[in-house]
A protein has these predicted regions:
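Mid-domain Rossmann-like dinucleotide-binding core that forms the NAD(H)/NADP(H) cofactor-binding site
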Residues: 129-200
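Glycine-rich phosphate-binding loop and adjacent beta-alpha segment
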Residues: 101, 220-285, 317-318
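NAD(P)H dinucleotide-binding glycine-rich loop of Rossmann-like/cofactor-binding domains
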Residues: 61, 65, 70, 85, ...
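A short acidic, Gly/Pro-enriched loop at the edge of an enzyme's catalytic core
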Residues: 208-215
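Glycine-rich beta-strand-centered segment in the early N-terminal region that forms part
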Residues: 23-38, 51-98
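C-terminal hydrophobic helical "lid"/dimerization subdomain
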Residues: 270-318
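Short glycine-centered segments of the SAM/dcSAM-binding site in methyltransferase folds
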Residues: 91, 153, 177, 237-238
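Short glycine/proline-centered loop/turn elements that form peptide/ligand docking sites
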Residues: 81-85, 178-189, 223-226, 246
Length: 318
C-alpha cells in the first residue's frame, strides 16, 4: 500500500511517499480502506519536533520510520475476531490511537473498534474525516470537562478554526449563548455557524467586553492569552486550555475567582464519536472543509496548516 512516511524530523520535504505492507489487525481491530484523512496542527508539530514525536507517538526504541496522522474516514475491509459492532463494507470514521501512533497517512489503517463510529450517510468521507480530532477536542472540552448546559455563556477563541468551528456548533446544539473571537476575515463565517456575538481581536480586547463567561474555551498558545481568558470568566466558571497548563500566576488568578480549570488533551473515544455522528445526522454540526489535497500532495496540506490562517478544516483525499 501507499503511505506517507517520516524518518527524521524537519520540514515538509521529510514526508516521503512510500510503498509498505498493509497493517495486520488484532482481534479487537478493523482494517479500514481509507478514503479521506484530516490534517491538524499537531501533525505538523510531530513532523517538526522530536520531542513532540516522542511524546505523542511514544515509539519503540528501535522504531525509526513513522507514519503520522490520526483522522480517517473509510470503509471496513476486515474485522477482528472479537469485533461485533462493525462488518465488512461499513463506512466508518474516527480518530485512531491518539495520543499514540494512529498511522493514518496510508491507504489502509488498523483501527481499534472502540475508537470509531459509523459514518453518517448524509455526509461525505471528507466531511467525516474532518470531524474527528478537532470535533472530539471541542466535544470533550465542552461536554466531558466543562459540562456545558442550556443558557451557558460560552467564549470560544479561534472560533473560525478547526476546533473552534466545531466548538461553536456543539455549544449551540446545547442551547448555549456563544461568543466567538477571531480576525475580521472570519467574522461572517463564525456568525453563520450560529455564534451570537463575535469579537475581532485585532480591534478590541475580549476581556474588556466579556467578564461573565460561564465557560471559556482557549485553544491559543501562551500564558498571557490564558490570563486574559481567566479575566473573561465569571467567578466559579470554567476555563478550558489546550496549550498552557494552569501553573504559577495562572493557577493563582484562577483560584482567586474559584474557577474550574482544565488543561486538556483529546483522546480517542468511540462513544464520543457516536455523539458527534448523531449531531451530524441531525444537521446540528457541519464540517467546513476549506481545502482538499490529493494523497501525493499531503506535504502541501502541512504547508497550508502552518500558515495559521485555515478556515475550518483541511482534508486529504486518498
Amino acid at each position: 500500500m501507499k503511505a506517507i512516511t517520516l524518518k527524521e524530523n524537519g520540514g515538509i520535504e521529510k514526508l516521503k511517499l512510500s510503498d509498505i505492507d498493509k497493517p495486520k489487525i488484532n482481534d479487537d481491530e478493523v482494517l479500514i480502506k481509507v478514503k479521506a484523512i484530516s490534517i491538524n496542527p499537531v501533525d505538523t508539530f510531530v513532523r517538526q519536533n522530536k520531542s513532540s514525536l516522542q511524546g505523542i507517538l511514544k515509539p519503540g526504541k528501535d522504531e525509526n520510520t513513522f507514519i503520522i496522522g490520526w483522522d480517517v474516514s473509510g470503509i471496513v475491509e476486515e474485522t477482528g475476531g472479537n469485533v461485533t459492532e462493525f462488518k465488512n463494507g461499513d463506512e466508518v470514521f474516527g480518530m485512531i490511537n491518539f495520543p499514540g501512533n494512529g498511522k493514518a497517512y496510508a491507504e489502509y489503517v488498523a483501527a481499534p473498534a472502540d475508537q470509531i463510529a459509523l459514518k453518517p450517510k448524509n455526509i461525505s468521507h471528507e466531511e467525516a474525516a474532518a470531524a474527528t480530532l478537532a470535533a472530539l477536542t471541542a466535544w470533550q472540552g465542552l461536554v466531558t470537562y466543562a459540562k456545558i448546559k442550556k443558557d451557558d455563556k460560552v467564549l470560544i477563541h479561534a472560533a473560525g478554526g478547526g476546533v473552534g468551528h466545531y466548538a461553536v456548533q456543539i455549544a449551540k446544539s446545547f442551547g448555549a449563548y456563544v461568543i466567538g473571537t477571531g480576525s475580521s476575515s472570519k467574522k461572517d463565517f463564525v456568525l453563520k455557524l450560529g455564534a451570537d456575538e463575535y469579537i475581532d481581536y485585532t480591534k478590541e480586547s475580549f476581556e474588556k467586553k466579556v467578564n461573565d463567561a460561564g465557560i471559556v474555551f482557549d485553544s491559543i498558545p501562551g500564558s498571557e492569552h490564558l490570563l486574559r481568558s481567566i479575566a473573561a470568566a465569571k467567578n466559579g466558571g470554567t476555563v478550558i486550555s489546550i496549550k498552557p497548563s494552569f501553573e504559577g500566576e495562572l493557577a493563582d488568578k484562577a483560584k482567586a475567582k474559584e474557577l474550574q480549570t482544565y488543561r486538556i488533551m483529546v483522546s480517542s473515544n468511540g462513544n464520543d464519536m457516536k455523539q458527534i455522528a448523531k449531531l451530524m445526522v441531525e444537521g446540528k454540526i457541519h464540517s467546513h472543509v476549506s481545502e482538499k489535497f490529493n494523497f501525493e500532495d499531503l506535504p502541501k496540506a502541512h504547508q497550508q496548516i502552518e500558515t495559521g490562517k485555515t478556515l475550518g478544516k483541511i482534508v486529504v483525499v486518498v
